[in-house]
């Protein structure tokens, strides 16, 4: 059973492997990625100069690299590779090939 706090985003097949997609959920800018069949949801706003470009980043070593200045964030939790706070991450559920995320009004880590 799915909690009412989850929002329906898209079908898994709507995502391209390794390519981010941008969504606005409850006024939160989200970057969604599918890597090896697993789906990850992170804040789309980089803490460095607040660029909303994370969805355009490339994937390297289970991290997304911000295209603006090269900061790396772990896909699983949004933390910076060097241990900094990084990006907010959001719970994802896939039910019958539909992706749902729980994006609540979280303050940014920066």
Regions of interest found by a model, annotated:
Residues 1-24:
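Zn-dependent metallo-beta-lactamase
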């Amino acid at each position: 059973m799915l909690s009412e706090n989850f929002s329906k985003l898209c079908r898994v097949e709507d995502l391209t492997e390794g390519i981010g997609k941008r969504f606005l959920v409850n006024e939160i800018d989200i970057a969604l990625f599918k890597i090896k069949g697993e789906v990850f949801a992170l804040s789309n706003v980089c803490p460095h100069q607040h660029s909303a470009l994370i969805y355009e980043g490339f994937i390297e070593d289970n991290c997304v690299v911000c295209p603006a200045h090269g900061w790396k964030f772990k896909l699983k939790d949004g933390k910076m590779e060097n241990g900094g706070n990084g990006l907010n991450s959001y719970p994802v559920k896939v039910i019958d090939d539909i992706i749902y995320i729980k994006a609540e009004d979280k303050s940014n880590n920066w």
